[in-house]
Amino acid sequence: MVYDKGEIDKGVVLSQWMVDEWGGDIRKWLEYWALYPDAYLDAIHDDEEDRNFKLLPYQSIFLRAMARYKTVSITATRGMSKSFSIYLGGFLRCVFSPGLRMCIVADVKKTVIMTAKQKFDEIFMHWPLLEFELKTRADDGEQGQKKSSDYYELLFKNDSVLTVISKDSSRGLREHSIVYEESAGMEDFWGCAA
């Protein structure tokens, strides 16, 4: 939304002159960051506040692959930040794709909510600006998060929705994009036994 001499919901004053003057450059940056999400994260990361954190090279490659390709598969050992990278990649796809409905399917039902909340809290700790991409719910003032016993959902200001569910849930069947966090433990993945 463009307001003359007014503040928009992300805390930035945006005028018609600014859109006319800088719109082309902003569009180019958004296109670049949509393909290089790791560069966007570097641009918004506060190195003074969070000196000990930097994406590892394989995380940057994975984020770029998630942003560009329809099908991506990684095989990685324990401790390689697979879940963190998947949740971060999903969040960024929703940021750069207005109206996207994305679903992340986790293997274990009991830990879906706890893991999702933990990973998104970690993401917001490293990149606090990302939390401003979420809607504020009118009913309780929470920052764009809906939780239930079997799903965790983030609602974005650009009308994207990111839902984290367990493999046993019927939610997420009509999404634009589905990510399987752990395909090894899921029966009949890709039409054959795992």
Model-based region annotation:
Residues 1-194:
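Phosphate/NTP-binding elements of NTP-utilizing enzymes
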